[in-house]
Design a protein with these regions (language model features):
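N-terminal glycine-/charge-rich "phosphate-binding" loop or analogous flexible N-terminal tail
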Residues: 1-54
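Short, conserved loop/helix-junction motifs that constitute active-site signature segments
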Residues: 27, 68-74, 225-229
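Short, polar loop motifs at secondary-structure junctions
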Residues: 16-17, 62-63, 178-183
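Glycine-rich, N-terminal phosphate-binding loop of Rossmann-like dinucleotide-binding domains
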Residues: 13, 61, 82, 208-210
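Phosphate/diphosphate ligand-binding glycine-rich loop within oxidoreductases
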Residues: 36, 55-130, 144
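Rossmann-like dinucleotide/phosphate-binding beta-alpha-beta segment
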Residues: 141-229
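Short acidic/histidine-rich motifs immediately flanking catalytic phosphotransfer sites
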Residues: 51-56, 73-75, 202-205, 229-230
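Short acidic active-site motifs
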Residues: 43-46, 63-67, 195-198, 220-223
Length: 230
């Protein structure tokens, strides 16, 4: 691929800037790239200053709002490093003709594995055992098995579906709740689609995978308030 030295790219993401392989690949294509080598969280005026003079940007957790797009009119393309879009004012981007590059579900396996690790950690009460050992004690802490449990997945999107696949190895009974119903997938994976009240009442392990927006901002509070004791 022919290098493009004319296009100026700003990488605000700290983790991207530290990633040796990603840096190499980007610089091979776009040698005129500025990285966040200071490793600071860029917001407000600092973020605007960093983006000034760049046509494209790769961002992660930095807030991009209408004021920023107005302050940096030369910015025409934003590539999202990660999948959450809650830090970007999509309407403001569209109104100003700024393009967005984003790949849904690119980290689905990483998140699904982490959820599985958390579930095993909590159901086997590993934090309690670790605290006892660190304190110099040794006592049997009886946990439970994940195998055969009723697992509720709220949000059967990219991560939810991948997690369901991993849970099949544990012979879990999987319940799911989503505003969209993928009947073909549920049939193949042995998933039962249920209402919100049902999944909250019946799940022994519950995991939530929803995009953060105005409709889901307080969803965890709702779930906790409706969970049965224990």
């Amino acid at each position: 691929m022919t290098p493009d030295p004319q296009t100026k790219i700003a990488v605000t993401s700290r983790s991207f800037s530290r990633h040796t392989e990603l840096r190499r690949e980007l610089l091979t294509r776009y040698p005129n790239t500025t990285f966040n080598d200071a490793g600071i969280s860029l917001r407000g005026d600092a973020l605007i200053t960093f983006l000034k003079g760049h046509e494209k940007a790769i961002t992660a957790l930095e807030p991009l709002d209408a004021a920023l797009f107005d302050a940096v009119p030369e910015l025409r393309v934003v590539g999202k490093y990660g999948v959450g879009l809650d830090m970007i004012d999509i309407d403001a981007m569209q109104e100003r003709g700024v393009k967005l590059g984003w790949t849904a579900g690119v980290n689905r396996r990483a998140v699904a594995e982490l959820v599985l690790a958390f579930a095993l950690t909590l159901i086997r009460r590993l934090p309690e055992s670790l605290s006892l050992v660190k304190a110099g004690g040794w006592q049997q802490v009886t946990g439970r098995q994940l195998t055969g449990r009723r697992v509720g997945i709220i949000g059967l999107g990219n991560v939810g579906k991948d997690l369901a696949g991993l849970l099949q190895a544990f012979d879990c009974r999987i319940l799911a709740h989503d505003i969209r119903e993928d009947k073909a997938f549920c049939a193949r994976a042995g998933i039962t689609m249920v209402g919100l009240e049902h999944i909250l009442a019946e799940s022994e392990v519950l995991t939530i995978h929803l995009p953060l927006d105005q409709s889901t901002g307080f969803f965890v509070d709702v779930v906790v308030s409706k969970q049965p004791p224990g």
